[in-house]
Regions:
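Interhelical loop/hinge segments that connect adjacent transmembrane helices in multipass membrane
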Residues: 1-10, 127, 187, 203-248, ...
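Membrane-interface junctions at transmembrane-helix termini in multi-pass inner-membrane proteins
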Residues: 7, 11, 140-166, 183-188, ...
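Signature of the first transmembrane helix
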Residues: 9-74, 102-107, 139, 169-174, ...
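Transmembrane helical elements of multi-pass membrane transporters/channels
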Residues: 12-28, 193-205, 209, 224-294, ...
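Membrane-interface helix-loop junctions in multi-pass transport and translocation proteins
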Residues: 34-43, 160, 171-203, 381, ...
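Helix-loop junctions and terminal segments of transmembrane helices
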Residues: 62-78, 92, 155, 213-214, ...
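Interfacial segments at transmembrane-helix termini and the short loops linking adjacent helices
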Residues: 110-135, 331-362, 434
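Transmembrane alpha-helical segments of multi-pass transport proteins
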Residues: 131-135, 232, 390, 404, ...
Length: 485
């Protein structure tokens, strides 16, 4: 019965993950144009510049949330309840300390913004940025210890609750933000609403963990060597987290410094599409994380373990590729027309920003399961090495290209770095260090790609000859393309 319940929870979780994705996209489609026209390009650019800056402090998590799943799975297999309680206590303590450090760092930045944005922001923008930075720093400081409860719920595979509570946040946030925007609170008002809803989610997760999942914790008397094991495991994940965060936020920060908030706004619109593109892949792979760790911890025969992990790698990859190929090819065909209608004048370059990010990212996104397989096998240091290379290449290229071609140059730099890391280095690591049959994986993907020939030909003629001057005609052609696909 328990196995059946877990199976149902995975199915419901996978379903709700796509409901959440759909909700995010629908809200973005309806809300973002309204927000852009109320805020204006510079104010929207300011909001994204500050969000990207403060988000860099999230690297202080040091990958501990991933370590929690690993050690929880180990203790759960042996039914070591007391060790789980002490694990909970250790994580709460560590994250509480990290939260304080993150808040203090954010507070320091808020009163010393000229250290980062000496020329990119005006005096008025700096004043608004200070308030936003304080709110976001407080949000980050509280969210760190609360993430222990999120990890606890995920470890129990209660994905339906996680996704349901986030769907509520996604759907309700615009209904609170729009009145504040109309009242003239601008980017500061948006930041305040984000803070309030995040606190609501945190509180809901705490109550659910304690009342429904019997969350308990104990401080002290930890297993000998536990913290050392956690630190060694998490330190390599931390490198990945830091590099991911740098690659995701670096472009906006550098554009804010060298090119101003208007160019950040153009970049942010393009990056938004890439963000939703990423969600399509991670939403399905997330529900397989506990199962991957269970296989690694329970299947002792290495050949059988690698066989099962390869099956998951291929299964998840094929599903992800089926969805992402439709989204990416569809954006290539319809993205330019959609951005013109949706965002309005001044955002034409956002189409190229999105393409420079989306196309190279596809390789990594259809292999998301491999990241967790590396972590479960404790060989994730190899991904860390490749990500360091990616970050350095991205940093150097972005500094030069963003000053020459603005937002498009910054996104092109990120795309080049992603191809180097994801297509070449990571696939070699998967094959050599995790035992995944990468050749079998790519054979499956190539066979699947044959089905794209007809849709691509159809898309070429639609993009070249079809009129898409309104939402109605655009929607009709999208339906035609999706039907052919």
């Amino acid at each position: 019965m328990r196995r059946l319940n877990n199976s149902n929870e995975l199915k419901i979780g996978a379903f709700l993950s796509y409901v959440q994705t759909g909700a995010q996209i629908l809200v973005a489609l309806l809300y973002t144009p309204v927000m852009l026209r109320i805020l204006g390009q510079n104010e929207y650019g300011l909001y994204n510049t500050i969000s990207s800056t403060i988000s860099m402090l999230s690297v202080l998590s040091l990958g501990f949330s991933n370590a929690y799943i690993r050690f929880y799975a180990r203790y759960k297999v042996n039914e070591e309840k007391e060790k789980i309680e002490r694990l909970n206590g250790l994580f709460l303590l560590v994250y509480f300390i990290i939260g304080i450090i993150a808040f203090l760092c954010g507070l320091y930045l808020s009163f010393n913004l000229k250290l980062v944005f000496d020329e990119g922001l005006t005096a008025e923008e700096l004043e608004k940025a200070k308030i936003m930075m304080i709110l976001l720093a407080l949000n980050l400081g509280i969210s760190f210890p609360m993430s222990t409860f999120t990890s606890y719920i995920n470890a129990h595979e209660r994905f339906s609750f996680i996704y349901a509570i986030n769907i509520v946040k996604i759907v309700c946030s615009p209904f609170v933000q729009i009145p504040l925007l109309l009242m003239g609170f601008g980017a500061v008002g948006m930041t305040a609403v984000i803070f309030a809803f995040n606190m609501f989610v945190n509180l809901a997760e705490v109550i659910y963990s304690i009342k429904k999942l019997n969350f308990r914790m104990k401080l002290g008397h930890w297993e000998k060597g536990l913290f050392k094991s956690l630190f060694l495991f998490s330190s390599l994940i931390a490198i990945n987290v830091i590099v991911d965060q740098v690659n995701n936020s670096l472009d906006s920060v550098l554009l804010g410094r060298f090119c101003g908030t208007a160019e950040v706004a153009v970049y942010s619109i393009g990056a938004t599409f890439c963000g939703y593109y990423t969600i399509f892949s991670t939403s399905i792979s997330t529900v397989f994380i506990p199962r991957i760790h269970k296989i690694v911890n329970s299947v002792q025969d290495k050949l059988e373990q690698n066989r099962q992990l390869t099956e998951i790698f291929i299964k998840v990859g094929r599903i992800q590729y089926l969805v992402l190929a439709l989204v990416c090819s569809g954006f290539i065909v319809f993205g330019r027309a959609f951005i013109a209608l949706w965002a309005g004048e001044g955002y034409e370059a956002s189409y190229w920003v999105a393409l420079c990010r989306m196309v190279p990212a596809t390789v990594a996104l259809i292999q998301n399961a491999g990241i967790e397989i590396q972590r479960a096998k404790n060989v994730h240091q190899y991904r860390a090495y490749s990500m360091i290379v990616m970050a350095l290449v991205n940093l150097v290229l972005t500094i030069f290209l963003c000053q020459r071609w603005g937002a498009v140059g910054a996104s092109a730099a990120t795309g080049i770095a992603a191809i180097l890391c994801d297509l070449f280095l990571l696939n070699w690591f998967y094959y050599k260090k995790t035992g995944i049959n990468v050749f079998r994986y790519w054979k499956n993907i190539l066979r699947q790609s044959a089905g794209l020939i007809v849709p691509c030909i159809c898309g070429f003629f639609i993009a070249r000859y079809a009129s898409m001057q309104s939402y109605i005609t655009l929607a009709l052609w999208i339906v035609v393309y999706a039907a052919v696909y």
